[in-house]
């Protein structure tokens, strides 16, 4: 009798355990499904934008977000999207997408580049490439304002007359780049410099500020351009392809969470290159956390009120 009673109690306990397990696992899975994973590259710009998206999503919906940081390259982001490791790529650039992911020729017209990228990403990968946030993080030849005033420099072509006596500081990578690198640049603009000095991209800003370099190749959204009083020269021959920045989201994710569409669209076309420079400098120059810079921007522009 005792054995039968013991077996009955064990059976009831097992049944209760299985019932509880069956109830709790779907709950855990559902909770996980309610967390949107936002991918950010290993640079301030990407972390700021990712944080803006995350804060807006959490404020305006019941969804939770987490940021997957340090996605080092265009290829890594693409793979993470395709594998479902991230739900949103916060910052993708048309120039990288066309020549890198899509293996196509660069398109110099910004509108055509965007339209082509959007079409091909939908067709090949079922990914939605949104319109731009409003800024273009491309290469930009940059000089001190003093040098610009001295030689009356407004465009890259204006440099040609003085190039043989100028020292140029450039990114190591750009010297070897095919299609849009140094060799093709000299052919397009018909100029060579008195000296060309490859270095890490982060060093070019101090090099031109200190006068060690006369002209450098910079990233157009870097905050040091403004804080150091530097001047970007217009690429009047459109040598560099556009690198307009957009978020990218799998269509599957948008079907599962249609509320994301309206949130993402709130940010499109709102952040120009000068604004992105300022935001980047808050992180790189004033050493603020990207999440703090993102929140301050969103509060200032009343994103949480609408």
Swiss-Prot record:
Induction: Repressed by GbsR. One of its GO terms (cellular component) is ATP-binding cassette (ABC) transporter complex. Changing residue 146 to K: In strain: ATCC 6633. The keyword Oxidoreductase does not apply. Keywords: Amino-acid transport, Cell membrane, Lipoprotein, Membrane, Palmitate, Signal, Transport. The keyword Signal applies. Residues 1-22 form the signal peptide. The lineage of its organism: Bacteria, Bacillati, Bacillota, Bacilli, Bacillales. The gene is opuBC. Changing residue 155 to N: In strain: ATCC 6633. CDD domains: PBP2_OpuCC_like (cd13608). Changing residue 8 to W: In strain: ATCC 6633. This is Choline-binding protein. It comes from Bacillus subtilis (strain 168). Changing residue 84 to R: In strain: ATCC 6633. Disulfide bonds: none annotated. Member of a high affinity multicomponent binding-protein-dependent transport system for choline. A lipid is attached at residue 23 (N-palmitoyl cysteine). It comes from the Bacteria. Belongs to the OsmX family. GO terms for biological process: amino acid transport; cellular response to sulfate starvation. It is found in: Cell membrane. Changing residue 13 to T: In strain: ATCC 6633. Its main location: membrane. InterPro entries: ABC_Gly_betaine_transp_sub-bd. GO terms for molecular function: transmembrane transporter activity. It holds the Pfam family OpuAC.
């Amino acid at each position: 009798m005792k054995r039968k009673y013991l077996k009955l109690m064990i059976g009831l306990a097992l049944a209760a355990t299985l019932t509880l397990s069956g109830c709790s696992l779907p709950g855990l899975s559902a909770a996980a499904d309610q967390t949107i994973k936002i991918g950010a590259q290993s640079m301030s710009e990407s972390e700021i934008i990712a944080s803006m998206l995350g804060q807006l999503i959490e404020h305006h919906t019941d969804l939770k977000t987490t940021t997957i940081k340090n996605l080092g390259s265009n290829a890594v982001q693409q793979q993470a999207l395709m594998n479902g490791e991230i739900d949103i790529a916060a910052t993708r650039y048309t120039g990288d997408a066309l020549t890198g992911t899509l293996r196509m020729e660069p398109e110099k017209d910004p509108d055509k580049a965007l339209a082509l990228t959007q079409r091909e990403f939908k067709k090949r990968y079922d990914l939605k490439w949104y319109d731009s946030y409003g800024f273009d993080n491309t290469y930009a030849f940059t000089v001190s304002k003093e040098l610009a005033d001295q030689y009356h420099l407004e465009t890259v072509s204006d440099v040609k007359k003085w190039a043989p006596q100028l020292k140029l500081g450039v990114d190591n990578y750009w010297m070897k780049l095919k299609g849009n690198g140094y060799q093709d640049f000299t052919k397009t603009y018909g100029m060579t410099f008195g000296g060309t000095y490859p270095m890490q991209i982060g060093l070019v800003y101090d090099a031109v500020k200190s006068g060690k370099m006369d002209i450098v190749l910079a990233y157009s959204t870097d905050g040091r351009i403004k804080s150091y009083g530097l001047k970007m020269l217009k690429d009047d021959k459109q040598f560099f392809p556009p690198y307009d920045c957009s978020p990218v989201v799998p269509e599957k994710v948008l079907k599962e969470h249609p509320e994301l569409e309206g949130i993402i669209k709130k940010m499109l076309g709102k952040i120009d290159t000068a604004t992105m420079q300022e935001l980047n400098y808050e992180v790189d120059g004033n050493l603020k956390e990207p999440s703090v810079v993102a929140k301050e921007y969103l509060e200032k522009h009343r994103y949480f009120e609408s």
